């Protein structure tokens, strides 16, 4: 409840991360995102969440946290620059969780990180929390409805894939009616 949490990336996984973080009621949640449609989505559906562009993120987090950086960082974007941004925005002794997948290996610039004493956690979904997640959705504690921004009949599944793959029309998730 006293933490500042930074989520880098507001795609489907980032928004689901946001929904789970909101259950813990941290003092402040900041979402870093460059896509204006995703920023608009966050502001519309989660007005208490702060949003910031990547190029302004480090300064914004430092100014808007109690300890000179985020207490917890979730790196969900997976862009070439977001791994570095994640640890740079973290305060000393913070936890940085890397959910994103990268196309290339990331470098730990240890001299630059010296003194931060960060804890890194990595990994995607291992399935061990699926039962609890489904229970929270069923109980209405996690509302995933807003994430479904488009619906297509099964006969138009190729159109749905094209929309999602090309990130058109502010798509977050597509539901396919069977």
Regions found by a protein language model. Give the residues of each.
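Mid-domain Rossmann-like dinucleotide-binding core that forms the NAD(H)/NADP(H) cofactor-binding site
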Residues: 1-55
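Glycine-rich cofactor phosphate-binding loops and adjacent beta1-alpha1 units
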Residues: 1-4, 39-119
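Glycine-rich phosphate-binding loop at the start of an alpha helix
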Residues: 11, 15, 36, 80, ...
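A local structural motif
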Residues: 27, 69, 143-146
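Conserved SAM-binding loop
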Residues: 31, 75, 122
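Conserved acidic E/D residue at the C-terminus of a beta-strand in Rossmann-like folds
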Residues: 33, 100, 124
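C-terminal hydrophobic helical "lid"/dimerization subdomain
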Residues: 84-88, 127-178
């Amino acid at each position: 409840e006293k933490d500042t949490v930074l989520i880098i990336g507001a795609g489907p996984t980032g928004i689901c991360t946001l929904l789970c973080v909101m259950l813990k009621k941290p003092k402040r949640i900041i979402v870093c995102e460059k896509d204006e449609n995703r920023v608009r989505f966050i502001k519309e559906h989660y007005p208490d969440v702060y949003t910031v562009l990547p190029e302004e993120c480090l300064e914004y987090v430092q100014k808007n946290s109690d300890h000179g950086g985020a207490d917890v960082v979730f790196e969900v974007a997976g862009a070439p620059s977001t791994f570095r941004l994640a640890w740079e925005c973290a305060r000393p002794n913070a936890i940085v969780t890397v959910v994103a997948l990268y196309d290339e290996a990331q470098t730990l610039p240890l001299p630059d990180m010296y003194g931060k004493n960060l804890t890194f956690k990595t990994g995607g979904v291992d399935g061990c929390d699926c039962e609890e997640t489904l229970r929270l959705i069923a109980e209405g504690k996690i509302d995933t409805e807003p994430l479904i921004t488009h619906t297509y009949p099964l006969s138009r599944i190729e159109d749905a894939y094209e929309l999602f793959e090309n990130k058109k029309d502010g798509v977050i998730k597509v539901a396919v009616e069977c």
